Amino acid sequence: MIPVIRSFLSLLLCVGLTFGLGGCVTTSLPMAAASPWNSQKLGIESNPLDVAFTNESHGFLVGSNRLVMETSDGGETWEEREIDLPADENFRLISIDFNGDEGWIAGQPGLLLHSDDAGQSWSRLLLDTKLPGDPYLITALGSKKAELATNVGAIYQSSDAGKSWQAEVVDAAGSVRDLRRGDDGRYVSVSSLGNFFSTWDPGQSNWQVHQRVSSQRLQSMGYQPDGQMWMVTRGAQLRFNPEGGDYEEWSKPVIPITNGYGYLDMAWDPQGNIWAGGGNGTLLVSSDGGKEWEKDPVGTATPSNFTRFVFLGGNKAFALGERGAILRWVG
């Protein structure tokens, strides 16, 4: 009798968990018939972290272990580039951006590079030793103008090619694990432990702190194409922000698949499809706003953790993996 009771209780627990998570939980998904991605292997051990282009054909990829690669054919092929940096420092080049021929690279520890000739040469900018944190995200805003955010949420702007910087916030947000900038200049950051997130709108003097919406720790957050927000939490859960101005209002969790691997990033492609990437070749796509999902065949066949999507406008996009693995958007 006792085994029967235990089985019944286990069934009730499973049903309760399924409904408590607010959606259908599955351990398998159908495979998409085709993929808009092309797999590339760069032949390196470093992790690619960001991509930016000066025009339709010419661009750069940066990453860990001082990685700099250049393309002149829209990203079909890449060649390693050497930048004059101290040999005894193993820089992590984490962010790159261009405005025409003017480019910026942010790296750790304490590195900021500037170019005014489409990346043919780079000069190192001196950063104040009192700068809170390390450079994390650089955004080119116009001629000689850029915005720099650090890994503790300090935000600065320069309008003289990086010679001087003006603080945008009075106090930093604290150590972050993820930080994103919206097209309208808003920022969202996830705390290093994932137990809360912070938002900053242009004109505010301080970051606004918000508690996480469930017991699941936050992994990453960002902005949807319409300016509303998305959230990835531990436990392979996705959430959406239905009211862009209300940072406390979130959808029930969406759990596309429970395969033991979490998600690391989300993005929207030019057709409005949602992509979610994560561990061990996890690359999923939804064409109906997150209700139904499919596995991408190219991503599934790529033995890598997909850490970030970079959609650059038009039909140019990349899914960045680890140890030189990237996917290029071919539509």
From Swiss-Prot:
Subunit structure: Part of early PSII assembly complexes which includes D1 (psbA) and PsbI; not found in mature PSII. Binds to the lumenal side of PSII complexes. Interacts with YidC.
Entry-linked PANTHER family: PHOTOSYSTEM II STABILITY/ASSEMBLY FACTOR HCF136, CHLOROPLASTIC, PHOTOSYSTEM II STABILITY_ASSEMBLY FACTOR HCF136, CHLOROPLASTIC
Lipid-linked residues (S-diacylglycerol cysteine): C24
Domain remark in the UniProt entry: A 7-bladed beta-propeller torus, about 55 by 55 Angstroms, with a depth of about 25 Angstroms and a central pore.
Membrane topology, as annotated: Lipid-anchor
One GO CC term on file: thylakoid lumen
Protein function: A factor required for optimal assembly of photosystem II (PSII), acting in the early stages of PSII assembly. Also plays a role in replacement of photodamaged D1 (psbA). Assists YidC in synthesis of chlorophyll-binding proteins.
Lipidation (N-palmitoyl cysteine): C24
Protein origin, superkingdom: Bacteria
Keyword Metal-binding recorded: no
Chief localization: membrane
Annotated localization: Cellular thylakoid membrane
GO biological process: photosynthesis
Protein name: Photosystem II assembly lipoprotein Ycf48
Signal peptide positions on this chain: 1-23
Gene3D superfamilies, sorted: YVTN repeat-like/Quinoprotein amine dehydrogenase
UniProt keyword Signal present: yes
